[in-house]
Amino acid sequence: MANLFWGKKKIAVVGVNGNSMAKRIVEEMKAQGMKGVVELDAPKAYPDYYTLAQLEPDYVLFVYESAQCKVKITRVEGLLGDRLGHNVRRDTEESRQAQSYYKHQLKMIGIDPILLGAEEIPLREVKDIPWFYTSKVPMLHLHLPKAEGAEKAVCKAVQDYFRE
């Protein structure tokens, strides 16, 4: 069922290390009417980061398969080098807000997520792509165990974010 809140939103699901969990999440999102879902491979170099930025997604989710469940925000910060003392830092407020929707959904299927910490994208890789440090879209790193219903919980958390 398509929805006004999330039906046309661009959502980038990045599968890290070619895991099957990312594919299952994408399939579930499409089944729930999220038409703008795109699956990407993990960025390894500048062209991959550039491709992600060109999509201009409304939500970015890096998915890892892991024994322990963690939902982390993405940090990009450092000296840009274009002028003396120009320090850039990605605004993480929207990411923190999006992160909060995972706790309830994952606990409902018996997974207790850790919501502390951040994963860093090296500034040297993305300093020429301003979208990474100027955009406020949620960019989360989701470490998920293989559990029954995990992809549905992730889909529901994303829907809840767009509903608010």
Label every model-predicted segment.
Residues M1-T51, P57, E77-L80:
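Active-site histidine-acidic residue metal-binding/catalytic motifs
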Residues K9-K10, Q32-G36, L55-V60, D112, ...:
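Loop/turn elements at helix/coil->beta-strand transitions in domains of secreted/extracellular proteins
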Residues V16, A42-S100, I121-H143:
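Active-site microenvironments of hydrolase-like enzyme catalytic domains
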Residues P113-E164:
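Active-site-adjacent mobile loop/cap segments within catalytic or ligand-binding domains
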